[in-house]
């Protein structure tokens, strides 16, 4: 809210769905622009202002591959504009989606998704380590990246594309943007903004790539507000 009072937009940038993100930031949601689904969907003032869907045939092919080549350990989520379509095996994905507050629907085949697909993800309840090399190089054309300890994402958008869309819409210079990231799916965003920060807990190659480190974004933002 203090940022907004100074004319600065705060933008949660996440792989999460809009409904989940808005609930998470409910007290200040009207002061935010929401970069959802890793840049696949952008919301402002409760309206979708930009969307970057995947080619339908490719999205379905990726979903089937993630499902069949994850050794019975992977559960697949296909993201629409504001609904998650779940191919689940009872291994924990559904409980996680319910916990974070997503709108969701259970499906049995990617062809059942009734809208444009913005992201395809696999949830690996034992962790992504054994599957990173299996999926990330294969689906590089769809920006395949590790998105946390249990998730691998594919999308034709990325956080960088999302940030560019926001800056164009709100007439903001990328050089005036500060961004915080902690994983490889943040690189496209961190590489284009004027002031990128990497979190202290990020992987070593990311900490080496970016000189600005912090344990908490709040610390940096409080200092920024003091000086501005």
Could you tell me what each predicted segment is?
Residues 69-180, 186-189, 201:
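Conserved acidic, metal-coordinating active-site core of Asp-based
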Residues 25-28, 45, 132-137, 189-191, ...:
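Short loop/helix-cap segments at secondary-structure boundaries that form the rim of catalytic
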Residues 20-23, 130-131, 162, 188-189, ...:
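Phosphate- and divalent-cation-binding pockets in alpha/beta enzyme and binding domains
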Residues 6-11, 30-32, 118-120, 175-177, ...:
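Short active-site oxyanion
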Residues 173, 192, 196-228:
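Asp-based, Mg2+/Mn2+-dependent phosphohydrolase catalytic module
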Residues 1-92:
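Active-site phosphate-binding/coordination module
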Residues 31-37, 52, 97-98, 144-145, ...:
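Short hydrophobic/aromatic-enriched beta-strand-loop microsegments
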Residues 3, 38, 163, 189-190:
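Hydrophobic residues within well-ordered alpha-helices
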């Amino acid at each position: 809210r203090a940022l907004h009072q100074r004319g600065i937009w705060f933008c949660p940038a996440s792989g999460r769905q809009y409904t989940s993100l808005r609930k998470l930031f409910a007290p200040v949601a009207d002061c935010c622009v929401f970069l959802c689904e890793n840049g696949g969907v952008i919301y402002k003032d409760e309206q979708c202002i930009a969307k970057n869907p995947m080619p339908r045939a490719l999205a379905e092919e990726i979903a089937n591959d993630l499902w069949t080549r994850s050794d019975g350990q992977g559960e697949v989520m296909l993201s629409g504009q504001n609904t998650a379509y779940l191919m689940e095996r009872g291994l924990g994905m559904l409980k996680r989606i319910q916990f974070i507050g997503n709108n969701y629907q259970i499906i049995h085949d990617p062809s059942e998704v009734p809208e444009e697909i913005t992201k395809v993800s696999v949830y690996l309840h034992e962790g992504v380590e054994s599957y990173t090399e299996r999926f990330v190089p294969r689906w590089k054309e769809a920006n395949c990246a590790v998105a946390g300890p249990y998730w691998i994402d594919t999308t034709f958008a990325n956080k960088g594309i999302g940030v560019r869309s926001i800056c164009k819409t709100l007439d903001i210079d990328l050089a005036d943007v500060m961004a915080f990231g902690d994983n490889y799916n943040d690189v496209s965003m961190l590489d284009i903004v004027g002031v990128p920060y990497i979190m202290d807990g990020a992987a070593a190659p990311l900490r080496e790539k970016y000189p600005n480190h912090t344990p908490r974004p709040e610390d940096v933002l409080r200092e920024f507000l003091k000086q501005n």
